Each structure stands twice: as C-alpha cells, then as structure tokens.
A protein has these predicted regions:
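Conserved ATP-binding/catalytic motifs of P-loop helicase motor domains
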Residues: 1-299
Length: 299
C-alpha cells in the first residue's frame, strides 16, 4: 500500500515518485476531502485549488485577500503585529519563498523590539538553512554557490571527500566545485562523480544566514537533538541571553541552555514566518499567507 500526494512541492523525491506512478493510471483510491481546513470558507478555497481553479479560489475568499503591490511584505508583517498576543501565538505567516521569509521575520522582529515584546542587546548568529537539494541536484555544479556549506556525513564519500565540513568557494572553468576544508585546504570536487544509484545521503548542502536573536524571540529548529528534546521543525522560545549562553524553553516546556559553539545555535531560525517547504505538514488555527504572482509553484 502506498500513500502519497503528487501535488507535493517538486524538490521532494517522494512527491515525484507518486506523481510518476499515478500518471500510469494504476488502481487507486482517492481522498479528495482535506481534513486540515476547518472553516467553510477555507474548505471551499482549498477545494477550488485542488481542482485547478485558482482564480475562483481567491475570489471565494473575498475581502480576506489583500493586494498590496510592492509593499506586500510590509503589509503582511503589520497584519500579524496588529493581532493580540494570544492570536499571535496561534497565527503563522506563510511566505512564498525563502527571501520573503527572511524579510518578514526581520520586519516582525523589528516590530516586536519597538513595542518591547522582545528585549536585550541580542546575539548575532550564523545559522544554516537546508538548500533543499535532491540527490540528483547535488550531481550538478550549478546547484552550488559561493558561501554555502557542504557537510559530508560519512567516509568514502563521492569525489574522495572525507567526513567533515567544507565551505563552497565557487565553480572553476571546468565545472568543478571549489571547496575549502576545515584546515583551510582548497579541494576541487567534481559533483558529476556522484553515483546516481547511490541512495545514501552522504552530502548535505546548507546556506549560511545571519540571524540576531533577542530574549522573547520565537525560533524554529532546522535539525534535531533528541537528547535535549529539540525536534526538527518544532518551535522554542528564547528566555534569556547572558555571557553568550542562550537559555530557551522547548516545546515540551523544558528549559535548555545552549553554550557558545553549541551546534544547535546554527540550527535555528526565527519562526514568525515560514516558507512553503517548512509549512508542509504544519497545521495552524490561523494563518496569514504572503505570495507574489511570480512565485507560481510556491504560491
């Protein structure tokens, strides 16, 4: 028995396989009623989207849809900031892309800082966000760009890479990826050497981002730490920052301390806005969606 949704975002391998299988018209049962939408207007809008009637779906939402032009990020952030503290806790901002997510988080954080909801001098961090590259995409030099981080999680990885971390320096004239290892040595890596039949996830590509966190900020984990009850995609609240030590409350209500150089300090990001990849599987009572007409697949 296989269960899947061919409408999943394209970079997800499982979604692609279900789309291919269904294109051959196998015997299958369809579940056309979504249980995630609870209100009548959202049930109607979701049903129209599944039917490919996008214009009609937006029209059914009426005044709930706001066209804000070039100021759509600013208007979205302001809509969330106008909510009561109780409604903020149960309202997510869904963004159509990673750039919009970063901008929305910054705007919301600035608004919270101005009203005193978050406090302190803040702690500047370099965080890592998944590049969402599939195994096949990792075989092409065009997937890599300067400033990214490549993590090799096992020995005898493709291209002779050993376990460790590598900074992506760029692409040379022969299409090889220039990597700098943890000792500072420059290595030329040919991604085409990756065996397409190798299903082991030996490589993980991430993008570096600068984040500032304050006391009271809401963050979201991009990786897990089972021992401390920090689960990927779950949210946590920053309780305090002192002498470089971050004290937070995890989803279970437990207090956790992260000292300087703790690997989980780079595996977090602000959680006021999340993009469409992060939103898969996320269910909220209320939501504010930001989308741009150019982001057709993500919107």
């Amino acid at each position: 028995v296989m269960i899947g949704d061919r409408a999943q975002l394209q970079p997800i391998d499982a979604g692609k396989s279900f789309s291919l299988i269904q294109s051959d018209n196998p015997a299958m049962a369809r579940i056309d009623t979504s249980l995630r939408q609870r209100t009548e207007h959202m049930k109607e809008a979701a049903g129209l989207v599944r039917a490919g009637m996008f214009k009609e779906s937006f029209a059914s939402l009426g005044e709930r849809v706001v066209e804000a032009g070039a100021d759509h990020d600013k208007v979205t952030a302001q809509k969330w900031l106008e909510l009561s503290p109780e409604d903020r806790e149960r309202t997510a901002i869904y963004s159509s892309g990673r750039a919009a997510r970063g901008e929305l988080n910054r705007m919301v954080q600035q608004g919270l800082k101005a009203e005193g909801a978050i406090q302190g001098e803040g702690l500047r961090l370099t965080t890592l966000l998944p590049a969402h590259a599939t195994r096949e995409e990792l075989r092409y030099a065009s997937t890599y760009s300067k400033g990214q981080l490549l993590e090799v999680t096992r020995q005898n990885a493709p291209g002779g890479l050993v376990r460790g971390r590598y900074d992506v320096e760029g692409i040379d004239a022969k299409g090889r990826v220039m990597l700098r290892d943890e000792s500072g040595k420059l290595i030329k890596f040919d991604p085409a050497a990756i065996d397409p039949s190798d299903k082991r996830d030996a490589l993980r590509l991430s993008e570096k981002h600068k984040e500032t966190i304050y006391e009271g900020d809401k963050i979201r984990w991009t990786e897990k730490d089972d021992a401390r009850g920090l689960m990927k995609s779950e949210e946590a609240r920053i309780l305090g920052i002192r002498d470089g030590i971050v004290t937070l409350e995890n989803k279970a209500g437990e207090t956790v301390e992260l000292k300087q150089n703790d690997r989980m300090l780079e595996r977090m990001g602000l959680a006021y806005a999340i993009n469409m990849h992060q939103a898969q599987g996320d269910t909220r009572d209320m939501a504010i969606g930001e989308m741009h007409s150019s982001a057709r697949h993500l919107s």
